[in-house]
């Protein structure tokens, strides 16, 4: 139903950024689980076709990692084959790809096991959902991906904005977001 509402408002020149897979990959959740190289890919292709049918530009985004480190301080892949399925669909359908899976690994590893919890909600107890700092770092990754993919949308981005390297994230200590009189900055809306 949400997608139908989105489609009803979509018009030529719009962009549809497509990123999902966190819950689809959980085989213990039968209500959301789908196989990566069959049903999941088919769903992605439906999103792409519906966007194109309306003159919009689809853009695929791989899922960001969960914050799960191995013993060497490297991020572990908890999404199985889903990121690769997205990459395959991007190639098969000739769709721009933003590899947030790869960029988030660089980001989390740069922060390390000690500082990376500062990018997540519930004071780092949540290893999936980001706080405002983490969401901002990932948003910068997406902006980088828009530029690297050569999307025409990149011309709408502020030209003097500094380039972002997820291996060199903004210092968490220096991050500030103006206070809101109605909402805490510990957890972003929609999370």
What residue ranges belong to the model's regions?
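A short, charged, Gly/Pro-tolerant segment at domain boundaries
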Residues: 158-173
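Alpha-helical cap/lid subdomain in secreted, periplasmic
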Residues: 2-159, 178, 186-191
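Mixed-charge, low-complexity intrinsically disordered regions
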Residues: 173, 181-182
